[in-house]
Amino acid sequence: MMISVGTDILEIERMERLQKKGRIDRIFTEEERRQSEGRISRLAGDFSVKEAVAKAFGTGVRGFSLLEIEVLRDALGKPFVKLYGNARKVFDSLEGQSIEVSISNTGELVIATAILVKKRNRDRTESFLLPLPKRNPASHKGSYGKVAIFAGKKGMAGAAFFSALGAYRAGAGLVYLYTEKENRTALQTLIPEAIQEDLEDTGQEIADKTVLLLGPGWGKDEEKKNILLDFLQRKESRAARYLVLDADALNLIAESETLETALIQYALQFPVILTPHLMEFSRLCHCSLQELTEKREELGEKYAREHHCVLILKSHDTMVFAPSDEGQGRHFFHNEESCPALSKGGSGDVFAGFLSGLLCVLQEKYGDRPPKDIAFQSACHAVRIQVEGGKRAVEREGEHAVLARELPHYFALAMEENIEKEEER
């Protein structure tokens, strides 16, 4: 990764003069003034950071206001910056990934350093990803597919909500929710856009769906096991183009040889995406977490090959595996970027839903390509967008404060930014 550095030295006495001239409001946001508690040395440090950031941009303070660079402190007192407006646009135009800042105080002087870390160039795997498409101006709701989501046991309506919201934010045309009766009133209020269906009535209703998503907060009782087995064995569900298995659907497969065999037979013909985190994958592989950690890439590639599935092995640096056709090279993507704000309950449900919506979007644009290729492409895009969207959320909400319900909005923003960048290439 490339970096650029900006350094600024400021006499604290100069800040006192600026305060006397009444210029503080033109330089510092209300939150910066509140956090400073009137301390001139603190304001001087923040001012110096703003100047250092502008120097790291290579522009100086031109084309944006100092108010658009906000200097705050975390719970431990470490400074960090938030960017707004034109300052944010400059950062994005430089393909910035993060800004690290530090401040030193001698009593008479403050010295600030800003390090702008730039994103690495797209690697070979990313370079062959299909461009994320703009929405077809001649489209209608049927153009962008139908996602059927089986999620949410009693008391887990949130999992169904997060998944449905993720699917809609990614661009799915219609989302159908199959959940417990006890969840329906809450879900009708939380996401009235979703169509509520009876969990017991899944016959021909499934045949016209683009994506089936099973598992978020679903539970592992015998009824759910039978539903999953029925989907894997009956022809109606195979009319759906894509099957995404998450959370409890994966746990059910890990506990049943019958389900695992049915999965393998199903995936021989139809595209399947699995989305386990490390603990869930250790159950699928019947290995310890330590063994998985030591041989993650090897085990992931083996499982994807033997089960004929696209495997998204979620971690702080997520890996995506897909069976490789003979002579076509290896289908593997490793996203080395991470976002710790995603380590919260519900983020996996959002991701599974967003992935399902992305499948609909790529199917609409690239429907003439092999479905298993679209499944791999969608998986890679979803992994990238998840991290980029998480970072957008951190900028506005703070690293500790991000909630799952907020993620679909930021994932969608990251997706739109990727679309715009593709158009500029």
Regions inferred by a protein language model and the residue ranges of each:
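Short, well-structured alpha-helical segments that form the helix of a local strand-helix-strand
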Residues: R296-R305, G367-G390, A404-A412
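Charged C-terminal helix
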Residues: V387-R425
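YjeF_N-associated NAD(P)HX repair module
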Residues: K119-F150, K154, L278, E298, ...
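Core catalytic alpha/beta fold that binds nucleotide/phospho-ligands
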Residues: M1-D123
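Short glycine/threonine-rich catalytic loop with a Thr-x-Gly-x-Asp
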Residues: N136-Y144, K154-A160, S338-L355, A375, ...
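Substrate-binding N-lobe of the ribokinase-like
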Residues: H140-D198
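Glycine-rich phosphate/dinucleotide-binding loop and adjoining beta-alpha-beta core of small-molecule
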Residues: Y176-E337, E416-R425
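Short, small-residue alpha-helix embedded
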Residues: R283, K344-R369, I374-A382
